Amino acid sequence: MLEARGITFGYPGAKPLYSGFSLQVEPGERVVLQAPSGFGKTTLCRVLAGFERPQAGEVLLDGRPLPRRGVCPVQLIQQHPERAVDPRLRMRKTLAEAGDVPQELLGNLGIRDEWMQRYPHELSGGELQRFCIARALATRPRYLICDEVSTMLDAVTQAHIWRVLLDYAEREGAGMLLVSHTPALTERVATRKVKLSRSES
């Protein structure tokens, strides 16, 4: 189980975004995190994936802190893929950060061989997001945190990306925490919804 226990987080000089926030995601669950813009959902995703450290509370995986070294079993896929890659690396090297990436996965995501030698700025947002998803899934994570991963993509690419993500979660029994402002998507995907209120943020 992925658990946020009593999380308090805020940036220096600002009011805490969260105070004592708790959340649990079980294996195989698809939990949608709902709140208006500006409530800090993206920040919470980063805390849960180990990118940010809370001022109080802890993030636990099966009762233990997330590992500080090696590949994290909780993978975050961000809304803006250009912020998740090194702009100086060609995409082949970006993928190599995950180790050996199965050719079948690349095929399922529609990643073309000619894209491998390109830099991030030479790809569209949808193409770059496919690489970020491949990199995350290649590590065989136990939990996926998807923060508006398809917001800026066309409808066909959105459907394709979500099919790959959901197929992985169903096959591996992985838990998912999703942030999305698309009601049709959340209604179709969610097994449970969690709403953030002012008292929690």
For each feature predicted by the language model, list its residue ranges.
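Q-loop/switch helix immediately C-terminal to the Walker
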Residues: 80, 87-102
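A short, flexible loop at the N-terminus of ABC-type nucleotide-binding domains that lies
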Residues: 1-4, 8-20
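ABC ATPase NBD coupling module
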Residues: 53, 63-75, 89, 93
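Conserved ABC transporter NBD signature motif
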Residues: 57-70, 101, 198
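Hydrophobic anchor residue at the start of the ABC signature
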Residues: 133, 145
